[in-house]
Every structure is written in C-alpha cells, then in structure tokens.
Amino acid sequence: MASDSGNQGTLCTLEFAVQMTCQSCVDAVRKSLQGVAGVQDVEVHLEDQMVLVHTTLPSQEVQALLEGTGRQAVLKGMGSGQLQNLGAAVAILGGPGTVQGVVRFLQLTPERCLIEGTIDGLEPGLHGLHVHQYGDLTNNCNSCGNHFNPDGASHGGPQDSDRHRGDLGNVRADADGRAIFRMEDEQLKVWDVIGRSLIIDEGEDDLGRGGHPLSKITGNSGERLACGIIARSAGLFQNPKQICSCDGLTIWEERGRPIAGKGRKESAQPPAHL
C-alpha cells in the first residue's frame, strides 16, 4: 500500500465538473494546478465545464485546489490508465456520532485497487479502516459482520500476505479531526466488495502485532465509529448527469447537501427578499 497522501502511488485520472463561463475561468483553473507536486497533466474543456486531472493526489486535495479559484467543483468519475473500466465504487460513511466521510475505490489493474477518501470528525491520530462482510446497517455499524475474510486468515496489516482481505490498516486524522488518504492494495478487488461495508474505528489497528486477545481478530482498534455500504460508482465519462432525476437538483445545488433526507431539500442559501 502507498502512503496516506502526497504524490506517491499510481497515476489516475479524476473527472471534475467545474463552473466555468469564459477563458479567464480556464486560465484560473490551469494556474491553480500548475506546478503542484503529484499533478502530471490537466485538461480543461470549457464548453463541457469539464476538467480532467492526471494525478497521484487524493481527489479531495485536487478539489480544494480547484475550488480555491472561487468556482464550484464536483468529482464525477475516476479512471486508471487501462483502456477498459475495471470497476469503481464509493462508500458514504456516517453513524450515530459526528464522524462522516466519503471513500472511493478504483480498480487500477486486475491486481491493484486504489482506496482514497476523506473522513471528518475523528480524534487526532490513527484509526483502523476495514471492509466488513455485510452491507447491513439495520443496527448501525454493529450489523456489518466481521472483517471481510473469504480466505479464513488471521487479522494482519495491509502489507502482510496472511491477513483479512478487508484489512486496510490505519488512516491518520490531523489536529482538526480530518483524515485525507490515498492507498493501494493488492488483495482487495472492487468486484468483491460492492454490497459490503466499510467501517472506520475508534482507535489504532495494531495490525495483529499487539499481543491483545483481539489483535488477531480485529486489530484491537476499538468501537466502530462510522460505516457505509460500498456501492458501484461511475468511472470516467460514465456520469453525464447535470440534473438529478429524483428531485430536480442540479449538480451545483447538490454540492454540500446530503444525498438523502430532509437536509437535501433545504436550500444552503437563505431565500431572496423580493
């Protein structure tokens, strides 16, 4: 697996919809990514309001750079250098507490899967991240079953050959409680985890080396803080949607709103005084 973040790892392509209306918008977008470590190339298509970024950075970091120009940006798809789409998925994490996040999966090659995401509301430090057996949230995260482990192995670290297939190690939250990470895994496959769940834990995963009775079972990483079902998502150019057919919101109106529930219908801006 690669590092939590930075410019290491396999290059992938991020497809963003960006609000652009003129050539100065294009110039500002290009300038925002120019010379950034981990960004190899940028394609800006004004007519389609589309920006393609070839990068090794987490999508959240690229999106923040784009939105630093004062323009909204929405990630619409991810892809690898492969000619065919090998599969992509996403998990929206939530729970009874304040922890929430988005984690994406992209099958880079038949042997290598990219996992990247952003999780907020954590205590600073390391937190175990695991794929679990079931996509069942009827009892919050407690009904998701054990770590995904079709091989009957003991719990271990992501670089161990003998480990649960769902053992993704730890992600680190900063002083503000945010974890931004990008990692690659040679055991996990997108097609094996769709319909299962992803869980972020309260504490550090000891990677099976801690000597605690739970070390070889869960990594002794504590309570389950937040979870989400892993669902199939769009690869490159597979998401042409500009308006949601379910409620008529544009992709710009959706930005910053929940994907479901009462909060989705409430405007993020106060009504105009007419």
Swiss-Prot record:
GO process annotations (BP): cellular response to oxidative stress; protein maturation; removal of superoxide radicals
Keywords from the UniProt entry: Chaperone, Copper, Cytoplasm, Disulfide bond, Isopeptide bond, Metal-binding, Phosphoprotein, Ubl conjugation, Zinc
Record-listed Cu cation 1 binding positions: C22, C25
Tissues expressing this chain: Ubiquitous.
CDD domains attached to this UniProt entry: Cu-Zn_Superoxide_Dismutase (cd00305), HMA (cd00371)
Record-listed Phosphoserine modification sites: S267
Chief localization: cytoplasm
Cofactor(s) the protein needs: Cu(2+); Zn(2+)
Binding site for Cu cation 2: C244, C246
SUPFAM superfamilies linked: Cu,Zn superoxide dismutase-like, HMA, heavy metal-associated domain
Cofactor comment text: Binds 2 copper ions per subunit.
Cross-link Glycyl lysine isopeptide (Lys-Gly) (interchain with G-Cter in ubiquitin): where in chain: K76, K189, K216, K241
Gene Ontology molecular functions: cadherin binding; copper ion binding; protein-disulfide reductase activity; superoxide dismutase copper chaperone activity
Region (Superoxide dismutase-like) location: 88-234
Matching InterPro entries: HMA_dom (IPR006121), HMA_dom_sf (IPR036163), SOD-like_Cu/Zn_dom_sf (IPR036423), SOD_Cu/Zn_/chaperone (IPR024134), SOD_Cu/Zn_BS (IPR018152), SOD_Cu_Zn_dom (IPR001424)
Entry keyword annotation includes Signal: no
PROSITE patterns linked to this entry: HMA_2, SOD_CU_ZN_2
Residue ranges constituting the HMA domain according to the UniProt record: 11-74
Binding, Zn(2+): H147, H155, H164, D167
Function: Delivers copper to copper zinc superoxide dismutase (SOD1).
Assembly information from the UniProt record: Homodimer, and heterodimer with SOD1. Interacts with COMMD1. Interacts with XIAP/BIRC4. Interacts with SLC31A1(via C-terminal domain); this interaction is Cu(1+)-mediated. The heterodimer CCS:SOD1 interacts with SLC31A1; this heterotrimer is Cu(1+)-mediated and its maintenance is regulated through SOD1 activation.
Name of the protein in its database record: Copper chaperone for superoxide dismutase
Organism, scientific name: Homo sapiens
Gene name linked to the record: CCS
